[in-house]
């Protein structure tokens, strides 16, 4: 979900990112990054001759970009196919981080290598493929406004019933310090009466409370 600006692309000799969401390929991604670096040092070629940076005017939240389902599954399956071409070192689709308030907040395709034609064509292929399926991405879980979601949770017999605040998700770059949701939850009597609904709220940073 990284946001790659033109400046970052220009000043990064080698760059790569995860190819699975959820990020089950963390180990593979680290290995790929290290192997690319070591290989370039050992063969004496150093920096890649060419870098293709293609901004794609798409902005998607992580909850819509799972690679376990379509279209993400097929889209990301094309990444290693591009990387396997002669003259290509790495290929990546950066979905972008939707909650970042900055100009570089959009998707990007990056391909690096020593063959200009292979790098260019690979980047264009991935960018066009991404654009072609831009309207097919859907939320991987039910979504509702806060009040409707809470009403559904309170009426359900399922335990636990989990609600996620997509806009302040500390596992996806959020600070986790927005208290609005917790404040609204505590207004409900169901969480204050004996024998009422129990609530676990995770999480808001509280260094002083931890120290106590």
Task: Tell where the protein language model's regions lie, with residue ranges.
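Active-site histidine-anchored catalytic micro-motif
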Residues: 1-47, 160-182, 186, 190-206
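Generic local-structure boundary detector
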Residues: 19, 23-27, 86, 90, ...
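Short glycine/threonine-rich loop-to-helix capping motif typified by GTGT followed
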Residues: 65-71, 152-154, 170-179, 212
